[in-house]
């Protein structure tokens, strides 16, 4: 199996999972068709399944054109969604089977209300796999366009509970921007400073900073560290200044999210 990031727009990644024996390819959140079609053509692969995490156009805009090229495409997307192009709709607890890999569907509302993620404990490249759209990023999380802090905190808890070695394939290259905020929020965190330098080096060489892992995000990502003393202290100081609620894990998360929104 190969997982390949196809760049789209200015900072999207369209993840393509290919069975190298058959050439069959699963595509996650194709916001644009052309870069995917070019990749498939250049590689000699063919698309047979699309996974949609949520309805935003930069995740769904290429579906119709891909379907025109591959009329038998299975298009999997969330139920009760503004996106109406799915041939198969799924919700939390459902399974999607592709080329011997079983993906469990997780409900992760917050960024949008219809947001889902796809997790498989079938190891690809020696790791379980998570396609999480815009819920979790490297050192960040999705902005709350539709959901509440309580919903997003619960969704991130769901992802945080996955095995530490789970490879996290998010949909955007936001890492350096996220790290600028994280370093501002936690200026004494030496691990963040070291990680920022490593990510700058990757980007200077044209390399993606994704995938990350659940374990790495638990150590570094301020949006997952609501029980970390350093993050709690920063959140309480911020909450006092901005008259926000304190005293719970969700309140810590909400303070960090509020801080990022106003950074």
Swiss-Prot record:
Cofactors required: Zn(2+)
Which amino acid positions bind Zn(2+) 2, per UniProt? 58-59, 134, 172
Catalytic activity field: an S-(2-hydroxyacyl)glutathione + H2O = a 2-hydroxy carboxylate + glutathione + H(+)
Query: A GO molecular-function term, please?
Result: hydroxyacylglutathione hydrolase activity
- Give the note describing cofactor binding and stoichiometry: Binds 2 Zn(2+) ions per subunit.
Q: Which keywords does this Swiss-Prot/TrEMBL entry list?
A: Hydrolase, Metal-binding, Zinc
Q: Which GO terms describe its biological process?
A: methylglyoxal catabolic process to D-lactate via S-lactoyl-glutathione
Superkingdom, natural source: Bacteria
Read off the SMART domains from this record: Lactamase_B
Q: Which InterPro entries match?
A: Clx_II_MBL, Glyoxalase_II_hydrolase, HAGH_C, Hydroxyacylglutathione_Hdrlase, Metallo-B-lactamas, RibonucZ/Hydroxyglut_hydro
> Pathway, according to UniProt?
Secondary metabolite metabolism; methylglyoxal degradation; (R)-lactate from methylglyoxal: step 2/2
Question: What Gene3D superfamilies does the database record attribute to this sequence?
Answer: Ribonuclease Z/Hydroxyacylglutathione hydrolase-like
Q: Does the keyword Cytoplasm apply?
A: no
**Could you tell me the EC number(s) of this protein?**
3.1.2.6
**What does the entry list as the binding residues for Zn(2+) 1?**
54, 56, 111, 134
The family this protein is said to belong to: Belongs to the metallo-beta-lactamase superfamily. Glyoxalase II family.
How this chain assembles, per its entry, is: Monomer.
HAMAP family in alphabetical order: Glyoxalase_2 (MF_01374)
Q: What does this protein do?
A: Thiolesterase that catalyzes the hydrolysis of S-D-lactoyl-glutathione to form glutathione and D-lactic acid.
> What protein is this chain from?
Hydroxyacylglutathione hydrolase
**Species in which this protein is naturally found:** Marinobacter nauticus (strain ATCC 700491 / DSM 11845 / VT8)
């Amino acid at each position: 199996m190969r997982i390949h990031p196809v760049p789209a727009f200015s900072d999207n990644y369209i993840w393509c999972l290919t069975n190298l024996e058959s050439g069959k390819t699963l595509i996650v959140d194709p916001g644009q068709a052309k870069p995917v079609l070019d990749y498939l053509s250049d590689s000699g692969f063919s698309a047979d399944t699309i996974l949609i995490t949520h309805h935003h156009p930069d995740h769904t805009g290429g579906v119709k054109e891909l379907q025109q090229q591959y009329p038998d495409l299975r298009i999997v997307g969330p139920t009760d969604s503004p996106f109406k192009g799915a041939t198969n709709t799924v919700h939390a607890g459902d399974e999607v089977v592709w080329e011997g890999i079983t993906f469990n569907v997780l409900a992760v509302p917050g960024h949008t209300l219809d947001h889902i993620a796809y997790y498989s404990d079938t190891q690809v490249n020696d790791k379980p796999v998570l396609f999480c759209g815009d819920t979790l990023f490297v050192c960040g999380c999705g902005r709350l366009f539709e959901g509440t802090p309580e919903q997003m905190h619960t969704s991130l808890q769901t992802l945080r509970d996955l095995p530490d070695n789970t490879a996290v394939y998010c949909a955007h290259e936001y890492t350096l921007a996220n790290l600028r905020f994280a370093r501002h929020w936690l200026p004494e965190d030496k691990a963040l400073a070291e990680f920022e330098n490593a990510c700058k080096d990757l980007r200077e060489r044209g390399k993606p900073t994704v995938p990350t892992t659940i374990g790495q995000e638990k150590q570094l990502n301020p949006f997952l560290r609501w029980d970390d003393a350093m993050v709690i202290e920063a959140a309480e100081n911020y909450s006092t200044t901005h008259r926000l609620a304190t005293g719970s894990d969700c309140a810590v998360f909400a303070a960090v999210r509020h801080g990022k929104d106003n950074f």
